[in-house]
C-alpha cells in the first residue's frame, strides 16, 4: 500500500503510526495536522523526532508530493505511505466531524 485514506488511517491503532508533514513553513503556519512532525523530505531519515519504528504517514497539501517521498522511504526500508489528498483531506474530515458534533449538540438542545 503506497497511500492511505483518512478513513483507513482512523482504523489504525493510534500509537502505530506517525504523521510527517512535509509542507513548507508558510503552509504549516496556516494550519497543521494535530500531532504531526513537520519535516523537510530530505531530513526525514536524520530527524530524531521521526519514529522510524512506526508507519510513517507522509502528508503534503494535496497528496501529490507525499507519494514520491513515501516511495523513497519505502525503498529505504521504512513503512511509509502517502496520505491521500493530503492536508486538505484531513481538514475536510475535521470540518465534517465538527459539523456533526454541532448538529448533535443542536439536536440535544432542541429536545430539552
Positions of PLM-derived features:
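Rhodanese-like catalytic fold shared by cysteine-dependent sulfurtransferases
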Residues: 1-18, 25-55, 64-112
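Short, surface-exposed ligand- or partner-binding patches at beta-edge/loop junctions that are enriched
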Residues: 59
Amino acid at each position: 500500500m503506497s497511500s492511505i485514506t483518512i478513513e483507513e488511517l482512523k482504523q489504525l491503532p493510534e500509537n502505530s503510526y506517525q504523521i510527517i508533514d512535509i509542507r513548507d513553513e508558510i503552509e504549516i503556519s496556516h494550519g497543521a495536522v494535530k500531532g504531526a512532525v513537520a519535516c523537510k523530505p530530505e531530513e526525514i531519515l536524520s530527524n530524531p523526532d521521526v519514529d522510524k519504528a512506526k508507519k510513517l504517514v507522509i502528508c503534503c497539501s494535496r497528496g501529490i508530493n507525499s507519494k514520491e517521498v513515501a516511495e523513497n522511504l519505502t525503498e529505504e526500508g521504512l513503512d511509509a505511505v502517502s496520505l491521500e489528498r493530503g492536508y486538505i483531506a484531513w481538514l475536510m474530515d475535521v470540518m465534517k466531524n465538527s459539523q456533526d458534533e454541532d448538529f448533535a449538540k443542536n439536536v440535544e438542545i432542541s429536545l430539552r
